[in-house]
UniProtKB/Swiss-Prot annotation:
Gene3D superfamilies: 1.10.8.60, 1.20.5.170, Nucleic acid-binding proteins, P-loop containing nucleotide triphosphate hydrolases. Belongs to the AAA ATPase family. This is Proteasome-associated ATPase. One of its GO terms (biological process) is modification-dependent protein catabolic process. ATPase which is responsible for recognizing, binding, unfolding and translocation of pupylated proteins into the bacterial 20S proteasome core particle. May be essential for opening the gate of the 20S proteasome via an interaction with its C-terminus, thereby allowing substrate entry and access to the site of proteolysis. Thus, the C-termini of the proteasomal ATPase may function like a 'key in a lock' to induce gate opening and therefore regulate proteolysis. SUPFAM superfamilies: P-loop containing nucleoside triphosphate hydrolases. GO terms for cellular component: proteasome complex. It comes from the Bacteria. Disulfide bonds: none annotated.
Amino acid sequence: MSSTENPDSVAAARELEALRAEASALRRQLAESPEQLREMESRVDSLSIRNTKLMDTLKEARQQLIALREEVDRLGQPPSGYGVLLGVHDDQTVDVFTSGRKMRLTCSPNVDAETLKLGQTVRLNEALTIVEAGNFERVGEISTLREVLDDGQRALVVGHADEERIVWLAEPLATVYEDSERESIAYDAESPTRKLRPGDSLLVDTKAGYAFERIPKAEVEDLVLEEVPDVHYDDIGGLGRQIEQIRDAVELPFLHKDLFHEYELRPPKGVLLYGPPGCGKTLIAKAVANSLAKKIAEARGQDSKEAKSYFLNIKGPELLNKFVGETERHIRLIFQRAREKASEGTPVIVFFDEMDSIFRTRGSGVSSDVETTVVPQLLSEIDGVEGLENVIVIGASNREDMIDPAILRPGRLDVKIKIERPDAESAQDIFSKYLVETLPVHSDDIAEFGGDRTACIRVMIERVVDRMYAESEENRFLEVTYANGDKEVLYFKDFNSGAMIQNIVDRAKKYAIKSVLDTGAPGLRVQHLFDSIVDEFSENEDLPNTTNPDDWARISGKKGERIVYIRTLVTGKNASASRAIDTESNTGQYL
């Protein structure tokens, strides 16, 4: 520095230099600030996300702590007891049966004593206070109702060991009984709200002394089918005379009670339909129930569509039970149900199919004498102290000779109608029920009659019947030799039935369907029916196999002299060589 320089100038220069440096620094800071701002914003966002995650974690941990605390509290609770409510008092105390003793307890504030129902299950805390009301008990012992006592709140029941006890009716059962008594309601048998009746099975808690529920008797429900059959007399062919007989026996007494009373004529209590298998015995019984319901509806001025009747179809062999007295009990329950239905003025038909399997002649059993008690039970039901008003018994059997004579005497099964095998005229009537004009018929067959479908089907039926009933070589079936030495040739027509005719028509329809698939030509032909007859006869060739040919002959409708020798005479399609059997020396091979 020169000695001539001014000190003030030097100071000013230095200050200016400092200001320039500061300005430069500010310029650099201003240039860097946007990048720092973005960095700071990014850090803020990151911290915010982290903070949110931490908050969620804390909330989840808090919820887990609360759940764990509740679980600890729940595990630490003392056990609860259960009891059956016996009664409610005005002071909000209740009587409860619990732990084998009757106790008077109080209700917690959360339970309204007035809403509790007798017989209801309640939950008790450690202080024996009612804290919750539950449902009615659903498990227990089954007892049979003997009678409901006059107060309508108690009942006399019988347990398994025939022990009688008085039990309270839980509120649902008591309410049903009171309503039915007050309103005189005839509840339906299947309704859970129908009136209690003797013989009902009840769910009972013998310790608490309460009956909770009516349990359907499955063993009886399986044996009895309540229905209004949709079968008409027009559906039955070839049995006009038998239908008239059963209508006179069943329908007239129901429809003209005043005339029967005027002439002092007692209506029949029962009808026996007997004859070979597959000839329409069950169909007739069902048609009777349907026709009777419609006739009574018309007499009362009701719509025939609303006609009501009951057809109790008893599965005969299943009625038998290995336990002593069970079969008799089932019979009592069946007739009890029939009387209840009939009390409404509705006709009830009790139909015993295969009657010989249940009510065979007493003393004829080989390994069992069950018939010695079952037969008297039926007799007592038919003509016992309790009448069978509006109830008629119909039995069906193909071995009427095995039914106990006491059942068949007048006053029990009064009317006996034989359902015979169809003759040629009856067979035409039966065929007409299955070969109807709505069926597709082959155009060639219709063309033979100038396009007259009705005439074609009529002639088709006549040809088929002629083929079935011709006493020709190809229709021979058996040669039987009787004990007196007489011989007789039996043809397939001697074993025809309505069921066989239906099967022949069904076979022919199947052949017609196969013909459509093979040739494309639709329609039923006479040849289809002829082929079906041959197949049906050939299949029946080997069917009459039994260890007792005389029994088989009786079932098939051939009664009379005892058969001692049988020889087959089948010569149709696929027929094997004739076979013979001497029934005296060999009883287990063919017939």
